C-alpha cells in the first residue's frame, strides 16, 4: 500500500489547505440529481491507489458474477484524483467509485463534489466511522472502508514488555543507555514528533482539548487554548527539555525518530501503521501496542482516520454506484480487503475477523481506534494545521509560554477562517 495515501491525514497539513482551496475556487457543480436507473448498467469504473489493485481485481470478479456488472479498474494518484475532482465533475469525466481519506470527505461533499451515500445495514459502521463520513450539514458523503490510528512501536530487544503508562516512559528516560551522543543530559529513550499537530493532538485531547466543538463540526468553537490544551503542551515541553535539539526541527524530526528507532537507540515511539514496513525492512525486532495512558490516567485520544468509498457528483448512474459501494463495505469484501492489504476494515464484523488474526499491529490499531476522536472533515480544518504547528514549536522551544502560544494560534485560526470562509 502506498504510504503516501495511507498517511495522508498525518502529513497533508498545508497540502490539504492548498487542495481544499483548489476545490473551493472551482465552480460548484450544479446540484442536479444523477440518473437513478440501473437496469441498463453493464460496466462500472473504480479509481484507486495502485496498492488496492489486487483487492479490487478479486472482489470485482465476485461482483460481476453476482450483479452481472463488469468492474473496470483504473489506478493512479488517488490524492491527485481528488484534487482535480472539481474539474472532472464539470467535464463529466469521473469514475463511478473512488476512495478518499476521511478528512477530505466532508469538505468535498459540502462543496458539491461528491454525491450523498446511503450507509447500508451491511456496512456495520460505528459512531466514530459514521462521524468521519458525515459533513457539517449532516449529510453522509462516503461509506467507511478503512480505519487508522497512531500506535506505539517498541523495540523488543530493549524492553521486555510494552510500556503501559507515560510514567513507564519517563523511567526509561532515566536509563543512561539511551543517552544521546554529543548532547549531555539528553535522551532518546522515547520519541514522538510533537511539533506535528497530528501526532500531538492525542496528548492535548487526552487532557481535555479539542479542535472544533460538536464532534468537530462547529468551527466557531475552538478548544485549543483551554486548560487541558495548556496542560498537554506543557507536558510535551517537559519531554523536549530531555530530547536532543534536533527534535525541535519541524521538518526533520520524523527522520530523526525513525533513524534512532531503527538503529536500536530508542525504546519506544509513537507513529502510524504506515511505518511498519520500514521497520520490517530495517529488521527491527519491534512490537506494537496501544499508546500508554497519560499522567492524568486518561487515554491518548489521537485522531481517528482512514479512508472511505465515495461517489463523484457527476456520475451517470448514482444507484449503480451506490450498489457497488454497498458491496464493497459488506463484511465479506471487507475481510478480503484486510487479507489483501493488511489495512484495518471499518466494518465492525470484518474488524473482529482481522483482530482474530493475532497480528500485533492490527490489534493495536483496533484497540487504539476505540479511544480516538474523529479527525474534523470540514473545510475549516485547513486553517488549523500551520497555526497549531507553530503553537507547538513556539511553546516547546521556549519562544512563548504555552498559554500565549495557544491563544495566538487560536486567534490566527479564527482570522484565517474568517478570511477564507467568511465566518
Curated annotation (Swiss-Prot):
**Annotated disulfide bonds:** none
One GO CC annotation: plasma membrane
Q: What induces it?
A: By maltose.
Q: Where does substrate bind?
A: 52, 77, 83, 103-104, 148, 193, 196, 251-254, 274, 307
**What keywords appear on the UniProt entry?**
Cell membrane, Lipoprotein, Membrane, Palmitate, Signal, Sugar transport, Transport
Q: Which PROSITE patterns match?
A: PROKAR_LIPOPROTEIN (PS51257), SBP_BACTERIAL_1 (PS01037)
Q: Which InterPro entries match?
A: Maltose/Cyclodextrin-bd, SBP, SBP_1_CS
What does a knockout show? Grows readily on glucose and maltotriose, but is not able to grow on glycogen. Deletion mutant is still able to depolymerize glycogen to some extent resulting in alpha-glucooligosaccharides increasing in size from maltotetraose to maltooctaose and larger oligosaccharides.
GO terms under biological process: maltodextrin transmembrane transport; maltose transport
Pfam families in alphabetical order: SBP_bac_8
At which residues does the record annotate a lipid attachment of kind N-palmitoyl cysteine?
Answer: 25
Its job: Part of an ABC transporter complex involved in the uptake of maltodextrins. Binds glycogen-derived linear maltooligosaccharides increasing in size from maltotriose to maltooctaose with the highest affinity for maltotriose. Has a very weak affinity for maltose. Has also a very low affinity for maltotetraitol, indicating that the binding is selective for maltooligosaccharides with an intact reducing end.
Q: Which family does it belong to?
A: Belongs to the bacterial solute-binding protein 1 family.
What's the protein called, per UniProt?
A: Maltooligosaccharide ABC transporter solute-binding lipoprotein
Its taxonomic path starts at:
Bacteria, Bacillati, Bacillota, Bacilli, Lactobacillales
Amino acid at each position: 500500500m502506498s504510504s503516501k495515501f495511507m498517511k495522508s491525514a498525518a502529513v497533508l497539513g498545508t497540502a490539504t489547505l492548498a487542495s481544499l482551496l483548489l476545490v473551493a475556487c472551482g465552480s460548484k457543480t450544479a446540484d442536479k440529481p444523477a440518473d437513478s436507473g440501473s437496469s441498463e448498467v453493464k460496466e462500472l469504473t473504480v479509481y484507486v491507489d495502485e496498492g488496492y489493485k489486487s483487492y479490487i481485481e478479486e472482489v470485482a470478479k465476485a461482483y460481476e458474477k453476482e450483479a452481472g456488472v463488469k468492474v473496470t479498474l483504473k489506478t493512479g494518484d488517488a490524492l491527485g484524483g481528488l484534487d482535480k475532482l472539481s474539474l472532472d465533475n464539470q467535464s463529466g469525466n469521473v469514475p463511478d467509485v473512488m476512495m478518499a481519506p476521511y478528512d477530505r470527505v466532508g469538505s468535498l461533499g459540502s462543496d458539491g463534489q461528491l454525491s450523498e451515500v446511503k450507509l447500508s445495514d451491511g456496512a456495520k459502521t460505528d459512531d466514530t466511522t459514521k462521524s468521519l463520513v458525515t459533513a457539517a450539514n449532516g449529510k453522509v458523503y462516503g461509506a467507511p472502508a478503512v480505519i487508522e490510528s497512531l500506535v506505539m512501536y517498541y523495540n523488543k530487544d530493549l524492553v521486555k514488555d510494552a510500556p503501559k503508562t507515560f510514567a513507564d516512559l519517563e523511567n526509561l528516560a532515566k536509563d543512561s543507555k539511551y543517552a544521546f551522543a554529543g548532547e549531555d543530559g539528553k535522551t532518546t529513550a522515547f520519541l514522538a514528533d510533537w511539533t506535528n499537530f497530528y501526532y500531538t493532538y492525542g496528548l492535548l485531547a487526552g487532557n481535555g482539548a479539542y479542535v472544533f466543538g460538536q464532534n468537530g463540526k462547529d468551527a466557531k468553537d475552538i478548544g485549543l487554548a483551554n486548560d487541558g490544551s495548556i496542560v498537554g503542551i506543557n507536558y510535551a515541553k517537559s519531554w523536549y527539555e530531555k530530547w536532543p535539539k534536533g527534535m525541535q526541527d519541524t521538518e526533520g524530526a520524523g527522520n530523526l525518530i525513525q533513524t534512532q528507532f531503527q538503529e536500536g537507540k530508542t525504546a519506544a515511539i509513537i507513529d502510524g501503521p504506515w511505518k511498519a514496513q520500514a521497520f520490517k525492512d530495517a529488521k527491527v525486532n519491534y512490537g506494537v501496542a496501544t499508546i500508554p495512558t497519560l499522567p492524568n490516567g486518561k487515554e491518548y485520544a489521537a485522531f481517528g482516520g482512514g479512508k472511505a468509498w465515495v461517489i463523484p457528483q457527476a456520475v451517470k448512474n448514482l444507484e449503480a454506484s451506490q450498489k457497488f459501494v454497498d458491496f464493497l463495505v459488506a463484511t465479506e469484501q471487507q475481510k478480503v480487503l484486510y487479507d489483501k492489504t493488511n489495512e484495518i476494515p471499518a466494518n465492525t464484523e470484518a474488524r473482529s475477523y482481522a483482530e482474530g488474526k493475532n497480528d500485533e499491529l492490527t490489534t493495536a490499531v483496533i484497540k487504539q481506534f476505540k479511544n480516538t476522536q474523529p479527525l474534523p472533515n470540514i473545510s475549516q480544518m485547513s486553517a488549523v494545521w500551520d497555526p497549531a504547528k507553530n503553537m507547538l514549536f513556539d511553546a516547546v522551544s521556549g519562544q512563548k509560554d504555552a498559554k500565549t502560544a495557544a491563544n495566538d494560534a487560536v486567534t490566527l485560526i479564527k482570522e484565517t477562517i474568517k478570511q477564507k470562509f467568511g465566518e
